[in-house]
Amino acid sequence: MKKIELLAPAGTMEKMKMTLLYGADAVYLAGKVFGLRAYGGNFTKEEMKEAVRYAHGMGKKVYVTVNIIPRNEDLEGLDDYLRYLEEIHVDAALISDLGVFSLAREVAPTLPIHVSTQASAANWRTVKVWKEMGAERVVLAREVSVKEMADIRKKVDIELEVFGHGAMCISWSGRCLLSNFFTHGKRQSNRGECIQACRFKYSVMEESRPGQYWPIEEDEHGTYIFNSKDLCMIDHIPELIEGGASSLKIEGRMKSVYYVAAVVAAYRKAIDTYYAERGAYRVREEWREELEKVSHRPYTTAFAFQEADHTAQEYVKSQPEQPYDFVGLILPAEEGTTRVQQRNHFRVGETLEYLTPKGDVGLFTVGPLTNGEGEAVDRAPHPLEVLTMQTEMKLPAYTILRRRAKHG
């Protein structure tokens, strides 16, 4: 059995490198154009080329999103862009639009194509057609259940990618017009400019049904009827693998370095444990605990085992919980030296928690600090400042330092 791929988001070069170091098999990213995350940082052409070189050097893959639903004016330069992706040997382009798909086949015939979830592939006949047109993989609509995925895989011999973790959209496969409505067309979600309107605070009243109430009218704080919980499938790795998924996708190109690294580390352990133990596999509580330490809304399995109903929505608040602060990042250093880049204030003598690229977690005490001028300091208040730290514990490069948030 071919091992399921762990696919992670890469909004920036730093995030890409961290997700690969923390165990992702592949990353998906976007260029400055033609993607659905216009505000996710994204990559210049040269950065994409470097990303491919870096990932391939680790034996890993890079997929580039070309998944906008384009208008006529969006097509300008698309042919050259697709040729460039082919030229730098990206491992696949993620495409949702039929016209873009056709153009890619025409101008970049050796460029592998994965059909984006925005294409809303929800049945085996649709998947079969995409395969016949030349797609190597289909990212199933998020609304497809595990059972439906298994049925599709039995009928069509093609790679299937499924979302396993991250924020969910209230719209069918992300096809939403709320951003267009609230900005009078100035921000268009299907062209990469989503304003997260589904997370706004709303109050809803239906005047023609007196005496009939919905949970959205529970209290004076309004409602978040559009505000989905976050997807979490950490408890269901066997079902995804045995159901025929080729790739498990983590959402979050606009999330922090800490978020993507920690989530990848948890799913890396779960996937590897499944293949090592098979019939004896069991979910570890520490995996769940790790996912509780990143910014998240309450978790749900959404459509995986039933049609999503009111329980898949979060009615209390729109902002995710942020239980831990990302405090610092251990940088490469000479033997016997520990260098740390500040990401949040910390001080000498403080107890912090660490998360290594292998997913190991533990506590340590911050030792004496020296700043870039060689001066001893008792705290690290400056953003991104690099300090030398004395510590008896040897922490590997790119270890994350964190602490429980005071509000968490």
Predicted segments, located by residue:
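Surface-exposed amphipathic alpha-helical tracts and adjacent flexible/coil segments at the periphery
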Residues: 1-21, 26-33, 52, 58-68, ...
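Gly/Gly-Pro- and Ser/Thr-rich, intrinsically disordered tail segments characteristic of DNA damage-repair
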Residues: 76, 115-124
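Conserved phosphotransfer cores of two-component systems
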Residues: 108
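Alpha-helix capping/helix-boundary segments
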Residues: 99-100, 168
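Glycine-rich, positively charged N-terminal anion/phosphate-binding segment
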Residues: 37-54
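Short active-site loop/helix that positions an aromatic residue
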Residues: 102-105
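Short beta->alpha linker loops
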Residues: 11, 96-99, 122, 144
